[in-house]
């Protein structure tokens, strides 16, 4: 299980009352995290690369600031994604059919049961292998998924290995993937073409031949890189029987705020790394007056004044290898709705 956040800061009901009466600007962030959850017993089935005794799991933390007070609210299982005045929830479900294993990503309104896709009978009856999805990015409109599949079916000439990216609508996790141009415009597809060309031009002919040179407009994604959201394209292997012959290509593309949220320019990644050389990621508040550092085994919350990072105010333990997949900021009334929702859900669960 992932380490639990700090629940003892203040009783939730007292905090909620204080927030309702506060006149100071209140701002906070819903932070969605992906980590590897151990499986407590050996797997009784063939799973290829997925046979790691772990699977992707997700948790959401609401962290708020009012005046100089920081609060880490009780965590939510899965990804709690703000969607207008309501919430959606996204997570992962492992399914097993004989020697075939699939980790599905699902999404549904928070007050509804998710529709879980089952394994196709042919795969379960005649194939051995796995298909694994994991979330790289989550927003009110889209999910960015990393998809891996490997296996062998009876009568096939050889095994297969696929590593692809897909950006799908939040309400359609079975979608095969949206074109980068449909989501970000034609200039984004040009950035994909240019990025792939630059990458291939830097390879020797023998290595270059390992890839399909024409980029797939739907094989792209969003992920965290140096404290920001960035776009990347994935080049597919020219031969599907070749293991791991795919390559991720960063794209020279400025994402609009609708995808990234605000990011103050006063705190550069180089400055953050000077302060914390082991920082994995950083999340800077819209007013640049506080930030959260993701370090190898914990989150560290720091005040910021005049561009200078202050001493740590709170820490939250995280599992090794934790990565951020959602960063959603809010202030005042929208944030109070988030606080009320998380507090109400926590009281209903206890």
Residue positions per predicted region:
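Bacterial N-terminal signal peptides that target proteins for export
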Residues: 1-9
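Boundary at the C-terminal end of the N-terminal hydrophobic targeting segment
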Residues: 22-24
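Short coil/turn segments that connect the beta-strands within blades of beta-propeller domains
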Residues: 28, 140-141, 288-289
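Bacterial N-terminal signal peptides
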Residues: 9-17
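Hydrophilic extracytoplasmic domains
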Residues: 249, 253-350
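Acidic, serine/threonine- and glycine-rich low-complexity intrinsically disordered segments
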Residues: 129-278
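Post-signal peptide N-terminal segment of secreted/secretory-pathway proteins
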Residues: 46-134
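Residue position within the beta-strands of beta-propeller blades
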Residues: 31-32, 144-145, 293
């Amino acid at each position: 299980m992932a380490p639990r956040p700090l629940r003892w800061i203040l009783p939730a009901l007292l905090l909620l009352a204080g927030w309702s009466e506060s006149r100071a600007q209140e701002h906070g962030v819903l932070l969605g995290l992906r980590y590897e959850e151990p499986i407590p017993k050996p797997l009784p089935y063939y799973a290829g690369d997925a046979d790691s005794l772990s699977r992707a799991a997700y948790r959401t933390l609401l962290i708020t600031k009012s005046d100089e007070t920081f609060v880490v609210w009780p965590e939510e299982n899965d990804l709690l994604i703000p969607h207008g005045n309501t919430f959606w929830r996204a997570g992962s479900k492992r399914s097993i059919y004989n020697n075939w294993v699939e980790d599905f990503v699902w999404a549904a309104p928070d007050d509804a049961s998710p529709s879980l896709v089952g394994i196709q009978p042919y795969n379960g009856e005649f194939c051995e292998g796995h298909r694994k999805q994991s979330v790289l990015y989550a927003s009110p409109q889209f999910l960015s998924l990393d998809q891996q599949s490997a296996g062998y079916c009876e009568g096939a000439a050889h095994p297969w290995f696929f590593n692809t990216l897909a950006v799908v609508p939040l309400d359609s996790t079975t979608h095969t993937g949206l074109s980068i141009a449909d989501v970000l415009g034609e200039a984004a597809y040009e950035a994909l073409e240019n990025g792939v060309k630059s990458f291939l031009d830097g390879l020797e002919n023998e290595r270059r031949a390992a890839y399909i040179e024409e980029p797939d407009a739907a094989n792209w994604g969003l992920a965290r890189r140096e404290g920001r959201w960035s776009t990347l394209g994935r080049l597919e292997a020219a031969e599907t029987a070749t293991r791991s012959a795919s390559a991720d290509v960063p794209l020279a593309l400025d994402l609009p705020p609708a995808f990234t949220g605000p990011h103050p320019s006063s705190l550069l990644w180089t400055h953050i790394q000077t302060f914390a050389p082991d920082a994995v990621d950083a999340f800077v508040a819209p007013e640049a007056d506080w930030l959260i550092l993701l370090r190898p085994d914990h989150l560290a919350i720091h005040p910021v004044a005049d561009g200078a990072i202050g001493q740590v105010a709170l820490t939250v333990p995280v599992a090794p290898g934790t990565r951020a997949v959602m960063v959603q900021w809010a202030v005042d009334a929208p944030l109070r709705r988030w606080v009320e929702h998380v507090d109400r859900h926590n009281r209903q669960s206890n």
